[in-house]
Amino acid sequence: MQIVHTLADLRAALAPVRRSAGTIAFVPTMGNLHEGHLALVRQARERVGAAGTVVASIFVNRLQFAPHEDFDRYPRTLARDAELLAPAGCDLVFAPAEAELYPQPQTFKVQPDPALAELLEGHFRPGFFTGVCTVVMKLFSIVQPQVAVFGKKDYQQLMVLRRMVEQFALPIEVLGGETLRAHDGLALSSRNGYLGAAEREQALQLSAALRDLLGAVRAGGAPLETLEAQACTALRAQGWLPDYLCVRRRTDLLPPGADEIAAGLPLVALGAARLGNTRLIDNLEG
């Protein structure tokens, strides 16, 4: 496995692949990798086969962090990450410095569709999806993959990026990787490392709240808004500060109508809440 830090070295490393018309699968990450990231790399490898090339990027993207968020304390663990990526099937790691990817202020940005990007995460983290779309579009332009793999744990992000690829007619197949969970059900996340021992145990309450909410919505008997408000109240009583707990249509993340719920329309429960100093997200389809 090769590790490169500059655009010139990346392009040189990929030149033989392009000359041979090989398939490139790309897995963008911010590093501090866990088994969920490695599963995405394995999925990329499986998609392109032994003859393909799997590229992973490691870059903590300042554009998607608000000033009060955890950009400065987000762990940078390149040496450890590289040790994990090689046996997972990665061929090439692109780990640029900020000045390499943004040599001057990034004044041209990708503004995602507000109908999707200003809901939920976009509402509570203004500018987040603009930062995500801008860096991913830039990385797509640099790497020029035929396949890209993103985790379904970031459910709304995956939807936004799929729409971006579609809207710009990019020749990229976007794959979603299933959320991996610890043995007790906690969704794997780089930010789980911020949790203390007691918080780590308590963190299971978020997925439990989503599961209960989804079940209550499917059972009917109360309006969706009432059930969502009750779920937030219950989680708040357990010491959390919820941004949202909601059930939405999988197609557009809009609230389902009562008739759609009764008809068994595919739904997803999504939640974001702060436990102590750590903001966690999760989702469950059902």
Swiss-Prot record:
A Gene Ontology BP annotation from the UniProt entry: pantothenate biosynthetic process
GO molecular function: ATP binding; pantoate-beta-alanine ligase activity
UniProt key word Ribonucleoprotein: no
CDD domains: PanC (cd00560)
Reaction equation(s) it catalyzes: (R)-pantoate + beta-alanine + ATP = (R)-pantothenate + AMP + diphosphate + H(+)
Source superkingdom: Bacteria
Location of the protein in the cell: Cytoplasm
Record: residues binding ATP: 30-37, 151-154, 180, 188-191
GO cellular component: cytosol
Active-site positions on this chain: H37
Involved pathway(s): Cofactor biosynthesis; (R)-pantothenate biosynthesis; (R)-pantothenate from (R)-pantoate and beta-alanine: step 1/1
Gene3D superfamilies assigned to the protein according to its UniProt record, in alphabetical order: HUPs, Pantoate-beta-alanine ligase, C-terminal domain
Binding site for beta-alanine: Q64
EC number, as in UniProt: 6.3.2.1
Binding site for (R)-pantoate: Q64, Q157
Class of the enzyme per the UniProt entry, highest EC level: ligase
InterPro entries, sorted: Pantoate_ligase (IPR003721), Pantoate_ligase_C (IPR042176), Rossmann-like_a/b/a_fold (IPR014729)
Keyword terms of this UniProt record: ATP-binding, Cytoplasm, Ligase, Nucleotide-binding, Pantothenate biosynthesis
UniProt subunit comment: Homodimer.
Note: The reaction proceeds by a bi uni uni bi ping pong mechanism.
Family the entry assigns: Belongs to the pantothenate synthetase family.
Described function: Catalyzes the condensation of pantoate with beta-alanine in an ATP-dependent reaction via a pantoyl-adenylate intermediate.
The protein, known as: Pantothenate synthetase
Taxonomic classification: Bacteria, Pseudomonadati, Pseudomonadota, Betaproteobacteria, Burkholderiales
Gene: panC
